[in-house]
Amino acid sequence: MRGAAPISVPPSDFHGIAFTMSSEFSEVLDGNTVAVAHPPPIEGFWSGVREALHGSRRDYTEGPIGRAILVLAVPMVLEMVMESVFAVCDVFFVSRLGADAVATVGLTESLLTLIYSLAMGLAIGATAMVARRVGERDLDGAARSAVQAIALGALTALGLGAIGVVAAPRLLGLMGASANVLAIGSTYARIMYGGNATILLLFLVNAIFRGAGDAAIAMRVLWLANAINIALGPCLIFGLGPFPALGVKGAAIATNIGRGTGALFALSRLVRGSSARVHIKRHHLRLEPAVMWRLIKLSASGTLQALIGTASWIGLIRILSTFGSGVLAGYTIGIRVIIFALLPSWGLSNAGATMVGQALGARKPERAERAVWMAGFYNMCFLGVVGVLFVVLARPIANIFTTDPAVVPYAVDTLRIIALGFLFYAYGMVLSAAFNGAGDTMTPTILNIVVFWLWEIPLGFLLAKTLHFGPRGVYLAVTIAFSTLALLSAVLFRRGRWKTRSV
C-alpha cells in the first residue's frame, strides 16, 4: 500500500461526463475531453483476455486504449492475484503456529519492506527506461537498460544480505520483539534477509518484462515462483511426508526456493528472447556507466519514494507493538488479507504505467493521460466492491485465519477501517504508478515525505496514545493519510509536468 496515492474522484472542477457506446467514456474537464472508461463489449472482453493470456505482441502506442489496457492488465492482475494468494496462504499456515509466529513474520516483513523499497525503486527505474525505449522503437537500448538494472540489483543484494544475516536479532529487538518472538524468529529473519537477492531479481526482471509490454511472461514467472512456495510451505512448516518440521523457519526456506526458481526462469527468458521483446545478447553483457548512471538517477528518487512510504510502516508497527503480540498478529492478518485486494489493483496500475511510458516514448502524451484515467476507473469499480465485502464480512474473514479472541478483534478493525478508503486508493494507486512510468519519480517522493512522515505517523501516535483510541487510531491514521495523499496527487497530475520528463 505504501507509495500509492489514492483518490476517489477526479478533481472537483470537471463539468460533466459524456458516455459513448465505445470501449471508453469521456470526462469533460475545463472544456477538454479526457477518456476515462466504459467496459468493452463482452465479446471483445473475452477475446482480449485470450490475447492477453497467450502473450500479445501488439503495439501499445496505437489502437484503442481500452483494448490495450485490457491486454496489459489481465496478466498483471492475475500475476498479482497469485501473489495475493501466496500472502494469504503463508499467513494461514504460519498462524497455526501461534501468535508469536505470526508476530515474527509481521516484524520481519516490516523490515523487509526496506528491501522491497529498494527493489521497487530499481523496478520503477527499469520499467520507465525500458518502456520509453520500447515506445521509441529502440529495442537494443531496452536490452542495454535491462542489463544495467540487473547488475545494479545484484550488487545491492550482496551488500544488504551480508548486513541482514549478521544483524537480524538486533533488528527484531529494535522493533520491539518479545523474548519469545526473538527466540523463534531470529533464524527466520536471517534466512529472509540473506535471501533478499531473490526478491530484488524477481522484482527487476519482471519490471523489465512489464515495461516492454510482455506482461504474460511476468505473470508466468510469478505463478511459477508462488506455486512452488505454496506447495513447499506447509511441507517444511509442518513436516509433511519426508520433509522435516521446521516451523516458521520452513516458511522462510520455502519462500526463498520459490522466488529463486522464479528469478532463474525469468532470466532465462530474457537471454533466450524467443517470445520477449527485450532480448539480452552477449554484446549487451557489459557495464555501461552512462546508461547505469541514468538508471541510478531515475531509481534513486524511486527508491527514496518507496523507502519513505514503506519505512513509515515501521513507525506504525512500532506504535502497535506497544499494545502486545495480539495486536501485531491481528494487524498482520488484516494487512495480508488487504494485500489480497490491493495487489490485483497494482496490476491495473502497472498496466497504466507501461502505457504512459510507451506513449511518451512515442510522443503521444494525450494518449498517456487518457490511459491513466481509464485504468483508474476500472480500479475504482474493482476496489469499491471489495471494500464493501471487507466491511460487511470482516469477522468471518478473520476467523478463517484464527479464532484466538486476543487476535480476531484487531484483525477485524484493520479490515474494516482501512477498507473505508478503498475508493480513494483506487485512482490514487494508478496516479502514483503513472508518475513513475513517466519517469517523474520526484513528485511522489515529496508527497510521501509530507503525508507519511509529517502527517500519518504523528497522527497515528496522537490518535492511538494521546487520545486513547488504541490500535484503531493507527488504522484511522492510515486511511486519513492516504485520502490526503490522493487529493494532492490529483492536483499535481492535472498540472501535466510529468509529460515533459526525459528518461
Regions found by a protein language model. Give the residues of each.
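Small-residue-rich hydrophobic transmembrane alpha-helices
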Residues: V102-A162, I199-A218, G330-A394, Y425-L447
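Interfacial/gating helices of multi-pass transporter permease domains
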Residues: V71, F93-T113, A179-T187, V248-K249, ...
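Transmembrane helical elements of multi-pass membrane transporters/channels
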Residues: L70-D90, I191, A225, G258-G262, ...
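Residue-level hotspots within pore-lining transmembrane alpha-helices
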Residues: M82, F86, I115, A119, ...
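N-terminal transmembrane alpha-helices
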Residues: S56, Y60-F92, R96-L97, S110-G125, ...
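Helix-terminus/linker motif at the lipid-water interface of multi-pass membrane proteins
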Residues: V77, V81-A103, R170-A179, C235-L246, ...
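Short alpha-helical transmembrane segments in multi-pass integral membrane proteins
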Residues: I7-A73, V130-A197, A231, F243-A300, ...
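Short runs within selected transmembrane alpha-helices of multi-pass transporters and secretion channels
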Residues: A123, M192-R210, A218-N226, A251-L267, ...
